[in-house]
Each structure stands twice: as C-alpha cells, then as structure tokens.
C-alpha cells in the first residue's frame, strides 16, 4: 500500500502529545523526483497504510503546501491573489489540532482532542486517518469578507495550495485525496475561526 497521507501522517503521538509548539526540521529542498513524473502519477487515494509519516516528511509536505520560499520577502510556495496570503493550513491529529506557522516553520496548538470526525463530514474513512490538513481562507485579507469576488479569490487560493499538496504527495509516494466535505461549523468552533475564515478544502 502507499504510505498513508491523508494526509496520513501518523507522526508518533509522542512528538505532539505534550508540546504546544512543534518545531519542524528544515525542509529538504533536494528531494528526488521531477514535476512531470509527479503529475503523471498523481491520483486520489482513499485506502491507506498505517505506517507513520516522519516529522521530516511532514515538514517537507507543509513547506511544499504553503511554506515560505523567499525569506527576504516572506513569499510562499503557493501564489495568492494580490499576495494577501489568505490561506492557513491546519493540521488535525488524534491528539489535537495545530496551525502551521509558515514564518517560523512550526506547528502551534489550537485545540487538544480528536476532531478528525469534523473533517470527515459524511465520509467515515477519514475518521481513522492519522492526520488531515484543512485549508482555511481568511477572506477579510482581501477587504470585505461578504463580497463574492473576495470569496472566489479565497477559494482559488485554497485550490492552489491543494494542488501543491497533491503534487508533493505524488512525488513522495504518499496517498492523499482533496476533499470539500467536512463539518465546517464544528471546525470553525474547534479551530477558533473568525466569521471571515472559511474552511475551503481538506486532504
């Protein structure tokens, strides 16, 4: 089986159980593989092995998703409309939910407890995935959060981050599937989101 990504990152529980901040190792910018090969092998997968993902792989995955690749300007691997960097990546683990802090390349604890069921929505196979990534767009970074155009830009930006995740997972031989199904209301409560922060997609 392909190593779980669902992102099936089972990073040993010990790595997260007691830490409110998890420092990630520096991303490996010299990983093997080509973009063309990754695109040719990209696929959505809903069956996962339970083998743990290393902290190094999680680090590379999050950096590829929406990390900072130009530190002098603070710009990201994923472009965003007007460079507003509206998409935040939340890491949902059995032990708790974390926000990926791209600037410091670390995970910050948001809520303790298992909220994988909120990510699953109506799809039960997600509930047992060791980890999911939830993509949240804060459309207020564009101005009026109620403006349709701003919400569309947020959805577009989340889609770009999602594609980065899919391509990285293909190259790294990790299984994943992009999803829009989730219990958005519960996630907004658990993750302490503002009204302007919209759950767009998850993996």
What are these model-predicted stretches?
Residues 5-13:
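Bacterial N-terminal signal peptides
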